Amino acid sequence: MKLLNSLILLVLTCLVSSINTQFISIQKYDFSGNCKNSSDSASSFEASSESAAICMQNDLLSGIVTNEGVCLIFNEVPTTFIISTKGDYIVRSIYDINDNNCQGGIIENKAIEIDECFVECADDYHGSTYLFSTETSLNYPSNTFMEISYNGECDGQWKTSFNYLQYYIVNKCNVAHEIETHTFSVGCNSTSSWVSEYAGEVCTVEPTVTTSYPIVDNCGDLDNSNFIDYCNI
């Protein structure tokens, strides 16, 4: 009887743990919006009045899926994300640009509404379109190149000790405006990934340069985290 009770308790504990586990999904879409006349356009989140129109799945460019509180680089600065106690918004905590472990103290907190498209403005005419959401299971799209951080045994079984992953939709034209305009597309196969860079803000011409990288499978880098690349095609 004691054994049966122990097994029931173990199952219930696993179920509660599974139910309480939430991942934060950050999806970046092709820019669509108006940043003109935004105050503090270099750093503020500007809500779009066309929230239902700008986050179309066909316009998805890249994304991040992360556990709460994990230190990662987001828009060029060290950042952590947590879900509010009531689960109605996500708190983005920004750290000093040189604080790659997010341990030197928070510079700024920003509250981000869940499941609402918004534009983070770079200037009057450029910005990035995002959609933040929460997930109870680990989800990511196909036709992507993925960079994954995980802890524990360095055996490639990253789903059991997952920190975060960043993905890029392959062969999609990305125009980044976080610090300066940078236009690129990403491709991959089982042995390598490559980044093609373009002049201007379109990818319809020949790339100015294409750089290839071997698929990464590193152990114990950056505060004992393991990193692995995955071509999810």
Curated annotation (Swiss-Prot):
Keywords: Glycoprotein, Secreted, Signal. The keyword Signal applies. InterPro entries: CfaA/B/C (IPR021837). It is found in: Secreted. This is Counting factor-associated protein A. Glycans are attached at N37, N189. Its main location: secreted. One of its GO terms (cellular component) is extracellular region. It comes from Dictyostelium discoideum. Residues 1-21 form the signal peptide. The keyword rRNA-binding does not apply.
